[in-house]
Amino acid sequence: MFKKVENKANFPKIEEKILKFWNDNKIFEKSIKQREGCEEFTFYDGPPFATGLPHFGHFVPNTIKDIIPRYQTMQGKYVKRNFGWDTHGLPVEYEVEKKLGISGKYEIENYGIENFNKECRKIVLRYTEEWKNIILRLGRWVDFEKGYKTMDISFMESVWWVFKNLYEKGLIYESYYVLPYSPKLATPLSNFEVNLGEYKEVNDPSLTIKFKIKDKNEYLLVWTTTPWTLPSNLGIAVGQEIEYSKIFDKTKEEILILGSKKLNSYYDDENSYTIIEKFKGSKLEGIEYEPIFNYFLEQKDKGAFKVHTADYVTTDDGTGIVHIAPFGEEDYKILKKHTNVDIIDPLDAECKFTNQVKDFKGLFVKDADKKIIENLKLRNFLFKRENYLHRYPFCYRTNCPIIYRPISSWFVNVEKIKTKLLEVNEKINWMPAHLKKGRFGKWLENAKDWAISRNRFWGNPIPIWICSKTGKKICIGSKKELENLSGQKIEDLHKDQIDKITWPSKDGGKFIRTSEVLDCWFESGAMPYASNHYPFTNEINFKNIFPADFIAEGLDQTRGWFYTLTILGTALFENTAFKNVIVNGLVLSSDGRKMSKSFKNYTDPMQVINTFGADALRLYLIMSPVVKADDLKYSDNGVRDVLKNIIIPIWNAYSFFTTYAIIDKFKPPKNISLAKNNNLDKWIISELESLKKILNTEIDKYNLTKSIESLLEFIDKLNNWYIRRSRRRFWKSENDKDKNDAYETLYYAIKTLMILLAPFIPFITEEIYQNLKTDEDKQSIHLNDYPKANENFINKTIEEKINLARKITSMARSLRSLHNIKIRMPISTIYIVTKNQNEQNMLMEMQEIILDEINAKEMKIKANEEELITYKAKANFKELGKKLGKDMKAVSAEISKLKNEDIIKIINGTSYEIKVANAKHYLSLNDIILEREEKENLKVINEESITIGIDSLITKELYLEGLTREFVRQIQNLRKEKNFDVSDRINLYIENSETLKEMLNKFEKYIKTETLALNIILNKSKLEKKINLADDIFTLIGIEKC
């Protein structure tokens, strides 16, 4: 019936074999096909870029995205799993620029947009084969053949449909606005893209500049940390309610104005200046000043070069007076509100000064700082120069500093739908739950309009054509619509082709497409519709594709894909795009840093899989805090520990069963009866049915942490209690009903456990299932239904009894370990203290098991601790300090003198009176801190409401029994070393020793039974191994098969 199982398994090799089995038999395809026509479970796969190889950070969501669809398929749902590729956008273009050795917009245009896009098309799927091989080797079942690519014409057309829908709802607009801008990419970025990058500590120049008030010999001291913005200065801002001082600087002999609170920051000596006047900032409003550069003097007639009040001005840094240029969001708003100035931007696409600022033309803005400072110093405008250490954003793609600048862009009006976004978020089940109101909810509350246009080349073109004469706009929502308007056949929708499509306007002009392409995040957010070519594919039932039942990605996607899905789902349908989401944290290297090839701070993921197996890696990741959106410091040792502590014990349980089942020719019946007589069988069956109930509940709630914890608890119970306590039932020679029940129970437990574990560790479960399955079973474990609990066999009473016995055993073993008393050394007595009558009754029923487990001769159950310990007490200062005041010290001294019997009274609820001077104080249990002192020879441990004690006095008889148990263990080890079969009978050879003689006199039968020794023979020539029975007791033994 069963194949022989090797004790030591090569798990990576087994996994390779299982992969071949799945492929050869098309098991994945069968798992989906058998659910056709069933209820559909919709799953969206967030598209990765294929320009880099997958790493541990990808393995976490890919494991989660395998577990849930496998589980839902086993629950009878039809789950399509099509892989997707993000093929457009900055990551691809940046890779191509590096490959071609070009950089920036101008060089790309010189190279030719069509040529550039051809290179993008070539490189975009560079690593798809590697991705496919690695993801499949991880054990993830996903359809790469039916996958989607964002550069597919069908996908791009659906994105146009999404865009037009938003446009017609008034949610798309074009405007100038100050946006984060990447100089190297020559394009604006969205706010959430900025958050995907890194904020670095930078040391920028901090300048205090003198601005002369018009027609007066007085100066405003203005502070800035961006010297490069000074040539574009159009205003000055002060705080309306901030107090300012007009002073006479005795050294410089100048009249200066600055915030009163900042005088000490600028002057060490109060005698170096005289205060002329103090006033609120409102008094400065409207004052004109002389510009420090003359590049934009024409803006004076439009309201430039005046002082304005602004709420954002403070005296935390600088002077309490700041300069205004259209390179900051707040500055931009003030200029728009109070002036009619043109929004000047004297920078080219790479953030170098243009001819408008001729003195610094061609200089990158950050490089221009030094020359601007020199210029101001030369012309006596520089009052003070310092350095300012602060955090500054860097581009997440190029690692260059982001520049904020006014730029024309297309936006989604997120502000308009913000209330609805928050309502939609309430419908989503977030795992972990805190993200709903926390990171994601807060991001939605503060959401700004989304800049969706990019001044780039390889992307989905914004489908708006503008009349060259009137500026009239036409938004296109499909390929056919464009063909009808232009009269031209459309084969490709990319910029290099689509920009050739124009047509005449009735007004005499020509319709030309706006030059920008869409942010690739817009495409990702449109994935639910575009991956299905919705609404152009008629056969699609929309409710089957929207909203998704489930998605999963990393924490960074709260400001990326989760966000864009939510915006577009809300804007289009006023609904969430996904119902349930599992969010994972970051996987860092063991030193807590980001994993990096240049740092060489992590092992190649495929090497880890080939060493420990994908199951061990999957389990390691899913068991970790990373599943709860926390960071994980990855360690190879962690994967090794999972293999050692979980995978191998599962294998050992399976190996144990098959070994004895083969010996006894056990054949499982078609229908195993779960009605058993043995309490151990009843218990493990009950635990298994309870586990089924927990898993069906928790995985349905997407709580993988609780699910894994419950599975691991059961594996421990099965291995370390059920199998260990049932061994003798399998060992005995007679094949009675009890032995058969043990086989049936263990077979049922292991096989069912494998099906429960299958979504989590698909390889080892398949391997074990293939050896355990009967002719009536499914071809693969993954074609089974997920097991449902049989409530009739859940017996909470027996679970409580055995789990109490397990708890007592665990406490006793800890106590032994603490005092170096080996488990094989018998003890005379265990004392168990519990006031709970029900627990006392259960303990009496479990007495035989507990004594056997902890190797004790007698068990005594007590209702209180007095027989085991004496008490001492200390004052609880936290409690008493509130009410005793000056008597505290004296009362504390009296508490330390309390006798054991007084403390017992307090424990039993009697209020105890202490007199200090003329005052009386009454003590309760909360007022004291208990200290326990063990009575002679007793070792005591307390856990919650239970205290146990063991008698540590080892008599000569107990000692001899302990040596005998160790002797048996050493013989069993030698059997394993010599690869004896578990059923092999042996001759045991010993040397002449007084200790062995004593042991044989008392325990010969026990030794023979345990070791399957038919004869114990004195024979020096057969001795082969020296063994250590105790610290200084050694002997020689030998064994051979009979």
Swiss-Prot record:
GO biological process assignments: isoleucyl-tRNA aminoacylation
Class of this enzyme: ligase
Keyword terms: Aminoacyl-tRNA synthetase, ATP-binding, Cytoplasm, Ligase, Metal-binding, Nucleotide-binding, Protein biosynthesis, Zinc
GO CC, any one term: cytoplasm
Keyword Manganese: no
EC nos: 6.1.1.5
Claim: Electron transport is one of the keywords in the record: no
Motif ('KMSKS' region) on chain: 594-598
Highest taxon listed in the record's lineage: Bacteria
Listed CDD domains: Anticodon_Ia_Ile_ABEc, IleRS_core
Entry binding sites for ATP: K597
Catalytic activity of the protein: tRNA(Ile) + L-isoleucine + ATP = L-isoleucyl-tRNA(Ile) + AMP + diphosphate
PANTHER family, sorted: ISOLEUCINE--TRNA LIGASE, CYTOPLASMIC, SOLEUCYL-TRNA SYNTHETASE
Self-association state and partner proteins as the record states: Monomer.
Entry-linked HAMAP family: Ile_tRNA_synth_type2
Cited function: Catalyzes the attachment of isoleucine to tRNA(Ile). As IleRS can inadvertently accommodate and process structurally similar amino acids such as valine, to avoid such errors it has two additional distinct tRNA(Ile)-dependent editing activities. One activity is designated as 'pretransfer' editing and involves the hydrolysis of activated Val-AMP. The other activity is designated 'posttransfer' editing and involves deacylation of mischarged Val-tRNA(Ile).
Protein name per UniProt: Isoleucine--tRNA ligase
Protein's gene: ileS
